[in-house]
Regions:
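Sec-dependent signal peptide recognition
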Residues: 1-11
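Bacterial extracytoplasmic/cell-wall-associated proteins, especially those involved in peptidoglycan
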Residues: 21-163
């Protein structure tokens, strides 16, 4: 898990966020990969789901750990690096096998500023405390056991109510 966090922090530093709090950088990276093409509302919603998971005892209690949660395996390269098992993580970008490089640094900087606001200010939760979201063209089996709260852009938001 430490290697996964180190990889994410390296991506953040390469994007110009090296001086920032790691949690804010992780949140920005998640919003960037999950919602960079969406409106501010769509980006806020993705950020709020991430933070709602941090507040929920069923997930780890840090943003970076929520994002990297899931099974990992040793890299086939023999380097000792632990990599996420494909398609078995909380956020698809993290374990889809594609590069996590930030290709739009200006977009990332704007999202990073948004992540700072989300981390440091109380806001009305536009997802109604949602802890899950799929794209509207996906029908995951888990959605049957969650309560739908809203739809923003192309994401449908759900809350996992039973603790």
């Amino acid at each position: 898990m430490e290697q996964a966090l180190a990889k994410i922090l390296l991506i953040i530093m390469l994007a110009g966020g090296g001086e920032a709090n790691a949690e804010t950088g992780c949140l920005a990276l998640n919003i960037y990969h999950e919602a960079r093409g969406q409106s501010i509302a769509g980006q806020i919603a993705v950020g709020q789901v991430t933070l709602n998971r941090v507040r929920d005892s069923r997930w780890p209690n840090s943003v970076c750990e929520v994002i990297t949660q899931g099974p990992h395996r040793a890299s086939w390269k023999g380097t000792g690096e632990m990599i996420p098992i494909r398609h078995r993580c909380q956020f698809s970008w993290y374990c889809d096998g594609k590069s996590d490089k930030i290709n739009q640094p200006e977009v990332y900087r704007k999202i990073f500023n948004l992540a700072q606001i989300l981390m440091n200010q109380d806001m009305i939760d536009i997802t109604s405390k949602a802890t899950h979201y799929p794209a509207d063209y996906v029908q995951p089996s888990w959605a049957k056991t969650k309560r739908r709260t809203t739809k923003i852009e192309d994401h449908i938001f759900y809350i996992w109510e039973n603790k």
